[in-house]
């Protein structure tokens, strides 16, 4: 297969949802339909050791939530699909945000009983930054759900995207009979399959087929025909151009737990979602089909292999081909390095990558030299843009039970901040260490990892900090004056960037007023 064909068949996407909308189950079933796993292990398998394939860090096993981002690759419908599993728990937004910068499309999973929830809104704001195309899956149709038309209206009004239903549910809860596939003009009858059983389904061609009346009863068949007439008249038609601009989403209905509807959604995703896209670098746009290799690091994760205390840098290949042993230019450090041991993933199971193409995600072993946002090329000095750091919303002071281990604590915190697990701030005026996060769970993760990886026992204390802002000023004199007058509120983050630590929002607003030439930023490019 030629290079252009290889790139053309790649589909790289992430799943976004509110916690508990069924994202981990969908991930499992996507892999099941892609034949990547033989048995779908659903989260918190009661009394069994069957943990979900994409939830593999110790803490995740305990809590039954997907905390870290795993990458899985599988073939489907003539394409090679790269699925980036994003942390679904309330608290893991920052990693999730960054993962969304590494994909070409997203699958939005909505609990049909609840509709659009808070976390989904936040994640959609991030996809807006790059107008990412979105495919929607309305999940849990085998439970009592809200009126489907009402949920579509909610998606349209709250997320600002037109909805084009591709399939439409027939009943719900105990009365869920299947879906009518509008594009194919056929009814697919629901039979529940669980775990790793993909059930045989029966399809009935045509909405007016008398077989449908026999299968679901005359009364229901009549009301389905009437409802669909209204739906097809009122809803948007699918428009590929609008989908690719992120303005319209195709919508599928089903139940991930019942193994139903996921394959229809995958067929749509592989058919319509874009192949690897052009990516903006500071110097120029980089096309996926360029022959020379380039890529950027969007995530660093420690301890992927409990047997080795290693860290893996996840790299999205933007253009060209990776081959085992090739030389790359690590642009930030200016060093040429030879990469012979990059890995591909199936959630915690690794395989050595011999060859990978634009759109693929590979893992580089990292001994502390690679940071989030780093660009690698075959020589050209490029810097890919759009990989953000987000100002934390929660803060704690961290201190040691054993004061002699200050050095290990600092080393551990700086390494954890480089991989985006948490942000660290060192005030200019004292020896405190302040930890900032986007969600509470990150604090637990940091303490448990400091203990298991750095042998450091740390505890938190409350601290009155409302928010943090990165400060920049093009006028050197003004910056000096600003620093002199605000010493008590200034700190350096893990990358030694000057940060304003605001005890209250009022304090921050006053500082912004007093120093109009200083920029206070809530996000910072890596």
From Swiss-Prot:
This is Peptide chain release factor 3. GO terms for biological process: regulation of translational termination. Gene3D superfamilies: P-loop containing nucleotide triphosphate hydrolases (3.40.50.300), Peptide chain release factor 3, domain III (3.30.70.3280). InterPro entries: EF-G-like_DII, EFG_III/V, G_TR_CS, P-loop_NTPase, PrfC, RF3_C, RF3_dom_3_sf, RF3_GTP-bd. PANTHER family: PEPTIDE CHAIN RELEASE FACTOR RF3 (PTHR43556:SF2). It comes from Aliivibrio salmonicida (strain LFI1238). The keyword Nucleotide-binding applies. Its main location: cytoplasm. Belongs to the TRAFAC class translation factor GTPase superfamily. Classic translation factor GTPase family. PrfC subfamily. GTP binds at residues 17-24, 85-89, 139-142. Pfam families: EF-G_D2, GTP_EFTU, RF3_C. One of its GO terms (cellular component) is cytosol. Increases the formation of ribosomal termination complexes and stimulates activities of RF-1 and RF-2. It binds guanine nucleotides and has strong preference for UGA stop codons. It may interact directly with the ribosome. The stimulation of RF-1 and RF-2 is significantly reduced by GTP and GDP, but not by GMP. NCBIfam families: prfC, PRK00741.1, small_GTP. It comes from the Bacteria. Keywords: Cytoplasm, GTP-binding, Nucleotide-binding, Protein biosynthesis. It is found in: Cytoplasm. GO terms for molecular function: GTP binding; GTPase activity; guanosine tetraphosphate binding; translation release factor activity, codon nonspecific; translation release factor activity, codon specific. Residues 8-277 form the tr-type G domain.
């Amino acid at each position: 297969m030629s290079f252009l064909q290889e790139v053309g068949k790649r589909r790289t996407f992430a799943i976004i949802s509110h916690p508990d909308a069924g994202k981990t189950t969908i991930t499992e079933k996507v892999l099941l339909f892609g034949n990547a796993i033989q048995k779908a292990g659903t989260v918190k398998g009661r009394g069994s050791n069957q943990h979900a394939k994409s939830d593999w860090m110790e803490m995740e096993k305990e809590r039954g939530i997907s905390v870290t981002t795993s990458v899985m690759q599988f073939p489907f419908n003539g394409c090679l699909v790269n699925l980036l599993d994003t942390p679904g728990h309330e608290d893991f937004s920052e990693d999730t945000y960054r993962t969304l910068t590494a994909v070409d499309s997203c699958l939005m999973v909505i609990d049909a009983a609840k509709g659009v929830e808070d976390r989904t809104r936040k994640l959609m704001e991030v996809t807006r930054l790059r107008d990412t195309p979105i495919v929607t899956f309305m999940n849990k149709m085998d439970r009592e759900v809200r009126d489907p038309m009402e949920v579509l209206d909610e998606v349209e009004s709250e997320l600002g995207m037109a909805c084009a239903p591709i399939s439409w549910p027939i009943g719900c809860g105990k009365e869920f009979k299947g879906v009518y596939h509008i594009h194919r003009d056929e009814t697919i009858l629901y039979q529940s399959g669980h775990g790793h059983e993909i059930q045989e389904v029966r399809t009935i061609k045509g909405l007016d087929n008398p077989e449908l009346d026999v299968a679901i009863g005359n009364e229901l068949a009549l009301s389905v025909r009437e409802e669909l007439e209204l739906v097809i008249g009122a809803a948007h038609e699918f428009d590929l151009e609008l989908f690719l601009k992120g303005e319209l989403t195709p919508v599928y209905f089903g139940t991930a737990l019942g193994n139903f509807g996921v394959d229809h959604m995958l067929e749509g995703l592989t058919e319509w979602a874009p192949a690897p896209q052009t990516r903006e670098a500071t110097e120029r746009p980089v096309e996926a089909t360029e022959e020379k290799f380039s890529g950027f690091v969007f995530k660093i994760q420690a301890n992927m292999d409990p047997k080795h205390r290693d860290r893996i840098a996840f790299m999205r290949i933007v253009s060209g081909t990776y081959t085992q042993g090739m030389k790359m230019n690590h642009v930030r450090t200016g060093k040429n390095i030879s990469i012979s041991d990059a890995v591909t993933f199936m959630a915690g199971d690794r395989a050595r990558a011999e060859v990978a193409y634009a759109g693929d995600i590979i893992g580089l072993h990292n001994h502390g030299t690679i940071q989030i946002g780093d660009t690698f090329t075959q020589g050209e000095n490029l810097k890919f843009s759009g990989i953000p750091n987000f100002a934390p919303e929660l803060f704690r002071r961290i201190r040691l039970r054993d004061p002699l281990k200050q050095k290990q604590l600092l080393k551990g915190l700086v390494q954890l901040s480089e991989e985006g697990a948490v942000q660290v701030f060192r005030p200019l005026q004292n020896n405190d260490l302040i930890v900032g996060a986007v969600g509470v769970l990150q604090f637990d993760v940091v303490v448990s990892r400091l203990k298991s990886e750095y042998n450091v026992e740390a505890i938190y204390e409350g601290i009155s900090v409302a928010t943090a802002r990165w400060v920049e000023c093009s006028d050197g004199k003004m910056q000096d004056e600003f620093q002199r007058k605000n010493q008590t509120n200034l700190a350096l983050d893990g990358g030694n960037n000057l940060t304003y630590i605001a005890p209250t929002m009022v304090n921050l607003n006053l500082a912004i007023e007093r120093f109009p030439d200083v920029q206070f930023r809530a996000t910072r490019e890596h």
